[in-house]
Structures are given as structure tokens and as C-alpha cells.
Amino acid sequence: MVLSEPGLYPLAASSGVVSGSAIAGGAEKESLEDLKARILARKRNPPQGGNEADYERFGEGLSHVSQAWARRPDGGPGSLAIWFLNAEGEIPVQSEIDQYMDHLHSRRLLGLRDIQINAPVDVPLNITVDLDPDTVDLRERVTASIKAMLKERSRPGLPPKRPGLADDDFILSRSWISEAISTVVGEDSHVLALPAGDLTYSVGRMPLTVNVSFV
């Protein structure tokens, strides 16, 4: 480890050795696409003194949180429910949920009495594609494209935006999957056998595990 500006710390050694086990926390280097998505989300949802987007940002500022979704179950300022994925885009474990809870308690507004931090329920997504041309390389790139689309578009189903409204289910459009396949360079044509139609995910449920089969 080397100080980038030794002149700012005249009493500190300019270099040192740190073992890997002594370094904790942190996250992998952010990709340009993830940075772009975060900046656009900030522009679309400027800080508003404790709205749902603010609490999503509070969580996404943690090293072990990649995405978060907040909703006020009763439509008022007194309660908040949050679902999130860890840094790997996977279901968080209890210790990660506890860290998120502690972090939000340190930043919550006084009127917020009840906070629920939830792990989404993974509903595996099974996809069957008849691909032309059908090569190993094209299969791999099609699978990667589908997973990238889901990372960008998918979310858990959420409670109603306001009392009296229906639940805000997440609807995965079949056309999104077909589009993700069609955009892969080298794909000439395909038939999407499964899913046969749009898929609906209720509160707390979302597609994370993706199984792509080729016929």
C-alpha cells in the first residue's frame, strides 16, 4: 500500500505492507455501465428529504448492496419496507440484512417508526430457445445478454404505491427476453419456446436464477 499524496501526511510512512486478511469491507471496482445507471437514477430521483428513493440510495451506498427497492406499505411516512440484493446481485444473508438495518436506523427521519428489511424470494426463470445459428459461442453470448437484461429490468413485486391500489407486481415481458436474444451479434433468428407469455411476480418475488436451454 502506497500513499497517493505523501506530502499531505508528513508524519506517516509513505508505504506499508498489509496482508489480505487485514482488509475488510469494500466492493469490486464499479463498471462504467453501473456508474451510468447510478447517475441516471440520481437525476430521475433527486433527494427529497426521506422519500423512498432516498432510502434506496442509502442502502446502495453500502459495499454489500447492489440494488434496493423501497415502498411505504401504508402509504404514509411512518413505515418503510425494503428489498435488496447483495453486492453479487444475490439473495442477502442475515448478516447483510442486519448491516442494512443498522445503517438505515442511523439515517432515518424521526417520523419513521417501522422499518422492514427483506430478502427477495428467488423464482427461477426457465427459458427455452431454438437458436439459429446454434453454436456454443452464440449460446454463451445469448445467455449473458438475457442475464444482463434481467439485471437492468427486473425487480421484486412491491406493495401498492398508495392505499387502495392493487399490489405493484413485477411483470416480466416475454418481448424483453426475445429482444435480448435478437440484439446479440451473430444471431440470425430464434424461436422463444419458453416462457410462453409474460410472467408476473407478486410482492417480494423476482427472477434471479436463470436457466437457459437450447433446442
Q: Where does each model-flagged region fall?
A:
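Intrinsic-disorder/low-complexity coil detector
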Residues: 5, 9-12, 119, 123, ...
